């Protein structure tokens, strides 16, 4: 494959729709191959804006504005990095010959929990929790009574856990309803899920293109309010469960098709594995791969997009701990104790231009002989990070 210089008439060009911390790492990996990177987001100086050749600030939900950037830039590949994008623009771009990663229909299915759950459970026959879709509080009450308590309630469209809650009894439903309605994204319809008393949950990063499909070692993670706070790799699991996880991941990613990396989220109980969700892009829990693998999830994504081989080496166990802001600031500062910077730990500051309470601003990455030791170390070091 040839790699022309960027900013030339024959450059290979990526258009990132969404420019957060994951998009930033994709941009960096793309630039390592001389790819011209254009980053788009709804606010200025987003993380990927800071490392791109050019950037745009637009309303990502506006079909006209998204298409205007696509037609102006004429990218070789369009990489949606967030859910909140006008899907009609992606379908039209694809119809006009632009290559959407992995493809517009996969983005459409995965940005909406109703679409992907119906596709996974009803079309592909994958094992999932029981579920109902509701659009009124009365419908929520009826669904919760049918499925039983506790139950999980989420908007059909939201990202990073926004709007997600667990109702443990009838009295919790009103609060769950309000949480869902306040979420970013479309909260006009909710999914109510049976609560699976799982042993643990994993992300199985799955990269695919015409050269084949590869699986990264499973990543364990801990969520709070539906958003990841810790992850570690590898997650210890039985060979039977791991094989089932790979079969589910292969089925769902083959069903969606296209090139790229997918974050397949799964619940595991004993040797039983349940499909939860899938993201057709790098996954936040996968930031740990920046130090555990010869090719991070971001490098694998870029290679998959370009049709390159997907081989990699798993180096060593590791863990990640997300740092969320505790203060509101238009001039945020991340502070870290010197002990965070030892030979087997790393701090990645995302460079977001503003901090809001609970906004993810940085991540600590740690290596150790075991994933458990790495997780313990990450937990200790994240306590030595602060913001102002």
UniProtKB/Swiss-Prot annotation:
The keyword ATP-binding applies. It comes from Nitratiruptor sp. (strain SB155-2). GO terms for cellular component: cytosol. Keywords: ATP-binding, Ligase, Magnesium, Metal-binding, Nucleotide-binding, Purine biosynthesis. Pathway: Purine metabolism; IMP biosynthesis via de novo pathway; N(2)-formyl-N(1)-(5-phospho-D-ribosyl)glycinamide from N(1)-(5-phospho-D-ribosyl)glycinamide (formate route): step 1/1. Belongs to the PurK/PurT family. The keyword ATP-binding applies. One of its GO terms (biological process) is 'de novo' IMP biosynthetic process. Its EC number is 6.3.1.21. It catalyses: N(1)-(5-phospho-beta-D-ribosyl)glycinamide + formate + ATP = N(2)-formyl-N(1)-(5-phospho-beta-D-ribosyl)glycinamide + ADP + phosphate + H(+). It is an enzyme of class 6 (ligase). Mg(2+) binds at residues 265, 277. GO terms for molecular function: ATP binding; magnesium ion binding; phosphoribosylglycinamide formyltransferase 2 activity; phosphoribosylglycinamide formyltransferase activity. Homodimer. Involved in the de novo purine biosynthesis. Catalyzes the transfer of formate to 5-phospho-ribosyl-glycinamide (GAR), producing 5-phospho-ribosyl-N-formylglycinamide (FGAR). Formate is provided by PurU via hydrolysis of 10-formyl-tetrahydrofolate. This is Formate-dependent phosphoribosylglycinamide formyltransferase. Residues 118-306 form the ATP-grasp domain. PANTHER family: FORMATE-DEPENDENT PHOSPHORIBOSYLGLYCINAMIDE FORMYLTRANSFERASE. ATP binds at residues 113, 154, 159-164, 193-196, 201. N(1)-(5-phospho-beta-D-ribosyl)glycinamide binds at residues 21-22, 81, 284, 352, 359-360.
């Amino acid at each position: 494959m040839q790699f022309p210089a960027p900013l030339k008439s024959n450059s290979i060009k990526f258009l990132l729709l969404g420019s957060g911390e994951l998009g930033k790492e994709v941009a960096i990996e793309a630039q390592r191959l001389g790819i011209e990177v254009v980053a788009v987001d709804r606010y200025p100086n987003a993380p990927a804006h800071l490392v791109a050749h050019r950037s745009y600030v637009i309303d990502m939900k506006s079909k006209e504005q998204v298409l205007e950037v696509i037609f102006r830039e004429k990218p070789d590949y369009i990489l949606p990095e967030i859910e909140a994008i006008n899907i009609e623009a992606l379908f039209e771009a694809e119809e006009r010959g632009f290559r959407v990663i992995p493809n517009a229909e996969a983005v459409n299915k995965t940005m909406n929990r109703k679409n992907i759950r119906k596709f996974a459970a009803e079309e592909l026959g994958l094992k999932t929790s029981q579920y109902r879709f509701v659009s009124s509080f009365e419908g929520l009450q009826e669904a919760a009574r049918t499925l039983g308590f506790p139950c999980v309630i989420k908007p059909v469209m939201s990202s990073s856990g926004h709007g997600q809650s667990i109702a443990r009894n009838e009295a919790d439903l009103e609060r769950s309803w309000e949480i869902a309605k306040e979420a970013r994204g479309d909260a006009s319809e909710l999914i109510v899920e049976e609560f699976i008393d799982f042993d643990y949950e994993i992300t199985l990063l799955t990269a695919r293109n015409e050269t084949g499909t590869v699986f990264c070692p499973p990543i364990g993670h801990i969520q709070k309010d539906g958003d990841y706070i810790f992850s570690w790799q590898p997650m210890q699991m039985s060979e039977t469960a791991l094989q089932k996880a790979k079969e589910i991941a292969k089925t769902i990613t083959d069903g969606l098709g296209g090139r790229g990396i997918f974050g397949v989220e799964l619940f595991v109980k004993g040797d039983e594995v349940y499909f939860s969700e899938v993201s057709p892009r790098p996954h936040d829990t996968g930031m740990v791969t920046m130090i555990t693998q010869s090719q991070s999830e971001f490098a694998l994504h870029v290679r998959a997009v370009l049709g390159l081989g997907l081989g990699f080496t798993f180096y060593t166990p590791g863990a990640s701990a997300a740092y969320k802001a505790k203060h509101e600031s238009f001039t945020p500062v991340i502070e870290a104790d010197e002990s965070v910077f030892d030979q087997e730990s790393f701090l990645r500051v995302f460079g977001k231009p503003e901090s809001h309470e609970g906004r993810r601003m940085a991540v600590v990455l740690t290596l150790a002989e075991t994933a458990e030791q790495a997780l313990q170390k990450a937990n200790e070091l994240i306590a030595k990070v602060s913001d102002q």
